[in-house]
Amino acid sequence: MSTASAFAINAPSFVNASSLKKSSSSARSGVLSARFTCNSSSSSSSATPPSLIRNEPVFAAPAPIITPNWTEDGNESYEEAIDALKKMLIEKGELEPVAAARIDQITAQAAAPDTKAPFDPVERIKSGFVKFKTEKFVTNPVLYDELAKGQSPKFMVFACSDSRVCPSHVLDFQPGEAFVVRNVANMVPPFDKTKYSGVGAAVEYAVLHLKVQEIFVIGHSRCGGIKGLMTFPDEGPHSTDFIEDWVKVCLPAKSKVVAEHNGTHLDDQCVLCEKEAVNVSLGNLLTYPFVRDGLRNNTLALKGGHYDFVNGTFELWALDFGLSSPTSV
């Protein structure tokens, strides 16, 4: 018998929520049975590069009313800009109101302090590391001395590459606590030695070498990868080199949502698919032999989650499994 339970988390307290629908299946002796039934579908990406939406500029800038004789480097001084406008007034007196307004604008810009410095990516990285080192690394020598000897994380986490949903930030993981894999739409493909080796290697390393105790697959609100899955055509040529082929890992989730909620608005379908795709990935994890062994030996557990950064909520559900009884024929 295979069951799954769910509970919602509205920080800071945990609140019981409706359990996920229970289902059962029978299998031969020694075969895992779980509530998630998943298939995989993939399509080879076309070698043709994606075409542009338009082959013309989005807009054309209108010709300026006043075109002073600016220098090419654009580094005119305040005095040079004013002199150019005064010269324009002498030549074209009818432009006096426009020129006067422009002079006022230049004067105001010259007087205002430049409070917004241009973004410096190198400086951002440097300042970020200095802050980390002074506030965390130096103040916690015991932790970092232990990490220098090796890692023994309890969690393996599959999360989306979306910049808004870093699991270490959202779940307050400390260094050494979670082995994290991030990709588009937090997907786990089925076991396959011929492709998706990056994910396969991560699962193998986490389970067999790091001996993680929990594998979490965490989806999130407003996921662009899931919206792509819901809107890309299932068949036909691809418009992307990699994205469409990748998100079809969870095509069974789309099929289920469309079949059960065909008349629902796309945004609501996407929310449903964000969670159902997690279930598909949990099912795909069962195709990895070393994951099944960990489940049989009670050394490993699988859980799914969904982070809603719009409302500040987190849902967590567990995958329970069982071995079927021997059957004589």
Curated annotation (Swiss-Prot):
The keyword Cytoplasm applies. Its main location: cytoplasm. Residues 1-108 are annotated as: Chloroplast transit peptide-like. It is found in: Cytoplasm. GO terms for cellular component: cytoplasm. Its EC number is 4.2.1.1. The keyword Zinc applies. PANTHER family: BETA CARBONIC ANHYDRASE 2, CHLOROPLASTIC (PTHR11002:SF56), CARBONIC ANHYDRASE (PTHR11002). This is Carbonic anhydrase. It comes from Flaveria pringlei.
